[in-house]
Amino acid sequence: LSHWSCAPRTAAQPSFLDDYYGCVYVLEENPWHLRTLSLSLREGQPHISLETDQESCTLQVGLHGDWIANDAFLSMPRENERLNMMFHTGPVRHWVSGGWASDFCFIFQVRSTDWMDYNTFYCRFNGQRLSLVVESNMERMSHCRRRIPMRPWPYPDHQIEGKRQSAN
């Protein structure tokens, strides 16, 4: 069953520990309204902090294909609100898994219990710079033989640039 995991294929840490941890990256204006992103390491477990104009959250990230439940996540746009309402399951939990795809690219995926949509975040670090891509996907229902008609998704996957905030 471990081969069936939908978690991103990643390593627990890069081959060398750089100074990505504990730094805040300020992001350029974007459709998601994300303002800052930071990556921290607490007791060997990565945590991602995200902030928008209205809210903020810190997510504990599961490693090695494990998913960790988080109680809070940002109010991300969802592709198909009607299906999300039909399959709502009660108290919302946000399951997060990820890790290092390379020495400079941290990937994490957020799947919520009441959404059919899920988001994958690709964080590419380059010195003082960060390139972030947020990819939104709709969970395919295996029992459906026909494609579910969708509206065009107004949030295209595109690169969001960020710059490391200088220490005061």
Label the predicted regions.
Residues L1-N168:
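Peripheral terminal and inter-domain segments
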